[in-house]
């Protein structure tokens, strides 16, 4: 796992400070499955949601978003959140799912709320920023924003499920994307089959 300032006997274990940001793109299940597979007993997990994300969650997830015990939610205007300053940045920030509007604001350094401020902090402190865009088709503006972000070192993992896994449910399809997100965070997982992987 990657090194961080909270390493305990590396490389055996590395506790990470992870911020999960949820925006208003359709695909709230991606965020739920990511949270389901991050262990707050092993990592420090924070969550922030945009206003539109709360509406989408209400429509797409019966019963709402479920936070595992130990996950720390923050309001969108909570500028005193522990990840809102370069003196205390997260090790990893994941925006899942990520709207094109959020992507554009991050690409151009806008920080009108704590979600966007956190992304700005992660970029300037050279920590890991992962965006999971869910939009189709893409405009030239979207692609140019993606180019800016890639040049800045951002990891883009489009919410495109793989079908070679033989998934039989929506959750299993979603997990093929979430598995890749976990890989890039640095969290070992077996939630989805790997290409050409021998079955146990």
Language model regions located:
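Cysteine-centered motifs
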Residues: 4-7, 14
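A cross-family phosphate/adenosyl-ligand binding-site feature
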Residues: 12-200
């Amino acid at each position: 796992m990657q090194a961080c300032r909270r390493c305990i006997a590396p490389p055996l274990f590395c506790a990470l400070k992870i911020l999960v940001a949820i925006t208003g793109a359709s695909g709230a299940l991606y965020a739920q499955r990511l949270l389901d597979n991050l262990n707050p007993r092993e990592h420090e997990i924070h969550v922030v949601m945009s206003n539109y994300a709360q509406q989408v969650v209400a429509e797409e997830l019966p019963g709402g978003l479920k936070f595992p015990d130990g996950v720390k939610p923050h309001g969108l205007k909570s500028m005193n959140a522990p990840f809102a300053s370069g003196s205390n940045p997260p090790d990893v920030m994941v925006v899942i799912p990520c709207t094109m509007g959020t992507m554009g604001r991050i690409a151009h350094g806008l920080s009108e709320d704590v979600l966007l401020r956190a992304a700005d902090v992660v970029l300037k402190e050279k920590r890991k920023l992962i965006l999971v865009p869910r939009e189709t088709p893409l405009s030239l503006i979207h692609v140019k924003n993606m180019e800016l972000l890639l040049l800045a070192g951002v990891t883009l993992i489009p919410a495109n499920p793989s079908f070679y896994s033989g998934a039989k449910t929506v959750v299993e399809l979603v997990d093929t994307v979430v598995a890749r997100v976990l890989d890039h965070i640095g969290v070992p997982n077996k939630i989805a089959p790997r290409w050409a992987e021998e079955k146990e």
